[in-house]
Amino acid sequence: MLAADKKKKVIDKFKTHATDTGSPQVQIAILTEEVKDLTEHLRGHKKDFSSRRGLIKKVGERRRLMKYLKREDQKAYDDLMAKLKI
């Protein structure tokens, strides 16, 4: 789970309009930050299997959203992948 201030920064960076909080682009960006945080946590806590399971779930959810975005709006998908460096 991201801290509120960090989540707000991610939303502000990737929103598509003024009140956007749930577009696929924003959701993918938030999940990417959560994946980065969990990956860093697991480097130091190798036996934390519940966090590992959470990481796998978040990666799967992000993959599904990326697949949806690619299918619906290829240009937005390409722009997002370039911004996130995925």
Regions from the PLM with identified roles:
Residues M1-I86:
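Extended, charge-rich alpha-helical interface modules
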